[in-house]
Each structure stands twice: as C-alpha cells, then as structure tokens.
Amino acid sequence: MTIKLIAGLGNPGPEYSKTRHNAGVWFVEELARSHNISLRPEKKYSGLYGKGLIAGNLVHLLIPTTFMNRSGQAVAPLANFYKISVDEILVAHDELDMLPGVCKIKKGGGHGGHNGLRDIIDRMANNKDFYRLRIGIDHPGHRDKVTGHVLGKAPSAEQAKIEQAIDEASRCLDIWLKDDLKKAQNRLHSFKAE
C-alpha cells in the first residue's frame, strides 16, 4: 500500500499562516517545494492542489482552504474523485502531545480533540484508517490556553525545531514511498532537532 494523497491541515489566510495550527500546511508546502510540485487553487476540492512524483509515485498534495474544522470538505471530495482509499491518505497536522522538533507517523486512531481530524473522520464515513503525520507543537499546560497556543506563533527557537522536524519528515516520506513504512518510522521517530 502506498500513499496517494497528502493533506496538510491549517487555517487559510495570512493571519494564520505562521501559527502553530498550520504545521501540517508547512509540511505540504515543503513537499511541494522539494519535489517541484505547484499548488494552485482548486474550487472542487476547496483547497490548494497539485500532483507530482515523489519517490517515483504519483502523489496528490492538498492544503484545504476551508477553516480547520471543515478540513473534510476538502479531503473527502478529492479522495472520492480519484478513488483513493482511506489507507492511501496521509494527513499532516499539529500535535499538542509532542514537543517541537518531534514528528511521528501513525495509522488510524481517534481525533484526540483535533477539529481537523474530527471533520475528516466524519466525512470519510467514520473511517479512521488514514495515516497521520503528527508534528509536535507542545501543550501550553492548561486546556484553557490551547486555543491561544495553537493560534499563536512559536518563538524562533521553537519554530526552528518544528521546521527541522518537517524537513526530516519530508526526507522520511521518500524512504517510506521507496522502501517501507517501518524504515521511515524508525528514522523519523529517532530524529532529534537541535
């Protein structure tokens, strides 16, 4: 099984582009840059869309331009149109329960309170079997501070760690698509940002 669709979650507009909640967007932007795939607005998928070869595999890239809690409105129509099964989808998103500089790949699971994941699960007929790239942004310590934290910008040292982890995740995606998931996970999960 290979990955055919990679979606990077976030909120649209310049006021959100540098916020922690857009870490998934940063990953897809990095993939587009490093693989020379242009992303263009596509109304029928409610997002920025492009396709190209990554490690010899045709991959669809999507950045929903809906707000985070409507991410499924973008992901589901694209998956349906190209007949991409749920387990051929990778969703990149910010993860409160991991430190900046850490990224992990997992398959399936709940939404963990993440509204973007919740909407995708809802619009995929409650099928949770897609892969996730969890990009650590850390937890602010109290649930009342979560909204301000995810919609805030990371301090520069923290941001640098997030970007290093995203770069490594991009390299590991190539390993995953060329070789196997386990090899990519072993490398990515042992990565430590400086």
UniProtKB/Swiss-Prot annotation:
* UniProt keyword Cytoplasm, yes or no: yes
Cellular component aspect of the GO annotation? cytoplasm
GO MF entries: peptidyl-tRNA hydrolase activity; tRNA binding
Q: Which GO BP terms, alphabetically?
A: protein quality control for misfolded or incompletely synthesized proteins; rescue of stalled ribosome
Q: Where does tRNA bind?
A: Y16, F67, N69, N115
Per UniProt, subcellular location reads as: Cytoplasm
Q: Where is this site: Discriminates between blocked and unblocked aminoacyl-tRNA?
A: N11
Q: Which residues form the active site?
A: H21
Principal location: cytoplasm
First-level EC class: hydrolase
Keyword tRNA-binding part of the UniProt annotation: yes
Source taxon at top rank: Bacteria
Q: Tell me one Pfam family matched here.
A: Pept_tRNA_hydro
Its EC number is 3.1.1.29
| Catalysed reaction equations from the record | an N-acyl-L-alpha-aminoacyl-tRNA + H2O = an N-acyl-L-amino acid + a tRNA + H(+)
Enumerate the UniProt keywords alphabetically.
Cytoplasm, Hydrolase, RNA-binding, tRNA-binding
Site for Stabilizes the basic form of H active site to accept a proton, residues: D94
Q: What does this protein do?
A: Hydrolyzes ribosome-free peptidyl-tRNAs (with 1 or more amino acids incorporated), which drop off the ribosome during protein synthesis, or as a result of ribosome stalling.
Q: Which family does it belong to?
A: Belongs to the PTH family.
Q: Which NCBIfam families match?
A: pth (TIGR00447)
Its assembly, as annotated, is: Monomer.
What protein name applies here? Peptidyl-tRNA hydrolase
Could you tell me which species this protein originates from? Colwellia psychrerythraea (strain 34H / ATCC BAA-681) (Vibrio psychroerythus)
Question: Which lineage do the record's taxonomy fields give for this organism?
Answer: Bacteria, Pseudomonadati, Pseudomonadota, Gammaproteobacteria, Alteromonadales
Gene that this sequence comes from? pth
